A protein has these predicted regions:
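A structural signal for short, hydrophobic/glycine-enriched beta-strand patches
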Residues: 1-105
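A structured, mid-to-C-terminal "fold-capping" secondary-structure block
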Residues: 85-153
């Protein structure tokens, strides 16, 4: 979010006083959870916009729909996909496959955990590799991602 904030301010001329950063997340599900709990819900926002690459948008949308859908006071979420540029066709296909697999896993988790923000918080902080203290020893270990998939990050 720091790079995005810099871009908004330096390239688009947005006032720094109009930009809020979310720096607690390590991934998309964290973006959804922390943007809601740190900014959107406490500040009573009426709308947020999720901007990401087209290949990533289906999973991003699933994350934001699940998390924001679990909060009665959550704002409406708009989605703005941007073009998939800057990678080979093979890398893009590898990433699309990875995104589909990750989206399927997310849907299974959402079904299991349900649409309750407290339950989602419990799940996120007890089972998710990025946020569960009982899994922090796994940081730095190889992921299941292939070399082609990793090149797209």
């Amino acid at each position: 979010s720091t790079v995005c904030a810099d871009y908004l301010v330096s390239e688009l001329g947005v006032s720094p006083n109009s930009v809020l950063k979310e720096t607690s997340s390590y991934d998309t599900i964290g973006n959804a959870y922390f943007s809601l709990t740190i900014h959107a819900a406490p500040l009573g926002w009426s709308e947020v916009c999720t901007v990401t690459s087209a290949f990533h948008m289906p999973r991003a949308r699933a994350c934001f729909d699940w998390i924001y859908g679990a909060c009665a006071s959550a704002p409406r979420v708009a989605y703005l996909p941007v073009a998939d540029e800057g990678m080979t066709e093979a890398a893009l296909e590898a990433r699309r496959r990875r995104e589909e697999e990750s989206a399927a896993a997310l849907r299974r988790s959402a079904e299991e955990v349900g649409a309750d923000l407290a339950a989602i918080s419990g799940w996120l902080h007890s089972t998710h590799r990025c946020y569960a203290v009982n899994r922090q020893h796994e940081w730095g270990e190889p992921t299941e991602a292939t070399k082609e998939e990793l090149e797209t990050y």
